[in-house]
Amino acid sequence: MGVLRGLVGDCDIEELPISFTAVATDLDSGQEVWLRNGNLFDAIRASIATPMVFTPVRHGDRTLIDGAVVNPVPIAPTLGDATDLTIAVDLSGPAESRPAPPISASLIADNSYRRRILKFVQAARPARVPKVPSRGLLDVAFTSMQTMQDTIARLRLSAYSPDVMIEGPRNACGFFEFWRAEELIELGRDRTAQAFARARS
């Protein structure tokens, strides 16, 4: 988390040049919580507090966890903003049989911001990848959570349709495969280009 703090710096959401909302979930009430002011790092930390991976975050009188538990594709927070285009990213797209091809590290070597992101991802990578049974407890838990989030995402998107939808295949990587960051960044670029091409056609 120290690397993440270094990426976002020490600033408040109100100081950002564009509007920002981090979405979290109130663990006790199950309510969706929009974090639109206060410390940026604290808001992001609460919004990524994935159950069984990161500890919940105490925010005022609430205990917050990952917002994806109740809203995997949060479009509603943007409805009040003055925007020309609404772009959504859904990581629960249709599964694909072939993984994305690996890319060269040179593609990100010349960009300091991407280097900082890669440093954060590499810091989270375990020294040794533990051998986990193909359908072990964690695998079943995360797959079940993903299935629930897929259903919630479809319901949310039926109510709020974005102008551009960028979809990533749900089986693009495992939950802890942080070391595949370069490959997945390139996959994201490819899917973004495809989504905008469809939107223009």
Regions found by a protein language model. Give the residues of each.
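Patatin-like phospholipase
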Residues: 1-201
